[in-house]
Amino acid sequence: MPTTPSAQGSGNQNTATSQQIVNNFRELIKDPKSLDEAVNYMYQTLLDDAVAGIFIETHHLRKTGNLSALDGVAEDSTYRICEMPNLDIFGISTAKKPMDCTCPNCDRLVAAARFAPHLEKCMGMGRISSRIASRRLATKEGSSAALLHSGGNAGGTDDEDDVDWSSDKRKKKSSQSSRNNGSKKNNGKTF
């Protein structure tokens, strides 16, 4: 019986390179009588290589403290269905919760649906507030121009700066008749 690499020690097989394995396999295939021996040799070599790789990897993971990572993350227990009143199947309350927000400006509780309009009015940032602010700026510019021309106090008071103070000096709206030359029809145009 000829001596084959499988009959030699398994230590030599582990150190054999892939080129040596291929060369040995080709020599064994040349003789049809030793074909069974060649298949056993190839199987044993591949099995030894795979087992040695697993051993080396497991040893490395144990030494580095990462062996628990090989097991993976433990799965939670199976999902439980909750069958209590006012709870959905996951155990979360289905009751409508009153959504109230606290205004950062006045510390009032305001319904969530009304929070944005409330905050807009509370901080003076709304459409009407911007009109009042632009009107206030226009009156300040007019009064400062009067102060420069007169050289003294124009008689203004602090009340003019207040948002809720109404001045008698406001311009009255022009009447419809003066705009249309007395005619409502055809916007005062004659044909």
Swiss-Prot record:
InterPro entries: SAGA_su_Sgf11, SGF11
Keyword Hydrolase: no
GO terms (BP aspect): chromatin organization; mRNA export from nucleus; positive regulation of DNA-templated transcription; protein transport; regulation of transcription by RNA polymerase II
Any matching Pfam family: Sgf11
Gene Ontology cellular component list: cytoplasm; DUBm complex; nuclear pore; nucleoplasm; SAGA complex
Transmembrane segments: none
Residues modified as Phosphoserine: 167
Composition bias type Low complexity, residue spans: 175-191
Zinc finger (SGF11-type) stretch: 101-122
A Gene Ontology molecular function term of the record: zinc ion binding
Region (Disordered): 146-191
Places the protein is found: Nucleus, Nucleoplasm; Cytoplasm
UniProt keywords, alphabetically: Activator, Chromatin regulator, Cytoplasm, Metal-binding, mRNA transport, Nucleus, Phosphoprotein, Protein transport, Transcription, Transcription regulation, Translocation, Transport, Zinc, Zinc-finger
Chief site of localization: nucleus
Domain notes: The long N-terminal helix forms part of the 'assembly lobe' of the SAGA deubiquitination module. The C-terminal SGF11-type zinc-finger domain together with the C-terminal catalytic domain of not/nonstop forms the 'catalytic lobe' of the SAGA deubiquitination module.
Family of the protein in this entry: Belongs to the SGF11 family.
UniProt function note: Component of the transcription regulatory histone acetylation (HAT) complex SAGA, a multiprotein complex that activates transcription by remodeling chromatin and mediating histone acetylation and deubiquitination. Within the SAGA complex, participates in a subcomplex that specifically deubiquitinates histone H2B. The SAGA complex is recruited to specific gene promoters by activators, where it is required for transcription. Required for nuclear receptor-mediated transactivation. Binds independently on SAGA to promoters in an RNA-dependent manner.
Complexes and interactors: Component of some SAGA transcription coactivator-HAT complexes, at least composed of Ada2b, not/nonstop, Pcaf/Gcn5, Sgf11 and Spt3. Within the SAGA complex, Sgf11, e(y)2, and not/nonstop form an additional subcomplex of SAGA called the DUB module (deubiquitination module). Interacts directly with not/nonstop. Interacts with the AMEX complex component xmas-2. Interacts with Cbp80; important for promoter recruitment of Sgf11 that is not associated with the DUB module.
Protein name per its UniProtKB record: SAGA-associated factor 11 homolog
Gene responsible for this protein: Sgf11
